[in-house]
Amino acid sequence: LYAEIIPLLTYGLIDLMKKVEGNTGVRLLECINPIKNKWRVRWDVQPGENGSATYMEEEFDHRPTEDEIRSTVITWHNRETDKDILSGFTYENVPVWLSSENQFNYKAAYDLAVQTAGATLPVVFKFGTDTEPVYREFATLEDLTDFYTKAMQHIQNTLADGWKKKDVFDLSLYAVD
């Protein structure tokens, strides 16, 4: 956590990123206190009902540079993509935690099963949550292939979605008159 916060502090971050409720016409870059030179950067504006919206916001103790704005928004998209990869996958309606370690273990088990024509099966993986674990046994190569392919497809789709969101980032929307 400290490794993530310290670089952000060097950019003059006062508060950590937070989700805020406001209106759809909110300015993406706004000086909220000219005397103290406090600025807010906003992104991911999601319209709600009756002109309301939710959005992410980060406060700076100076007018952020274009690089700081870009870095703030892109860093958030990267973190959201990572979170979706880690905790956004379900298999047979059971959540599957796709940490790097788990991805490695799933790949190793799958590769070994393929290389041995299934001789290393069955293999058991723990899915679900710590409070509600589900132990899933894969007894056939076809069964394990189905799981592994779907897990990898989830990762690829999530990465592609994250790339699209970063690709449409438009710094010109942060111009101040």
Task: Go through the PLM ranges and name each one.
Residues Y2-D177:
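A preference for well-ordered globular domain cores
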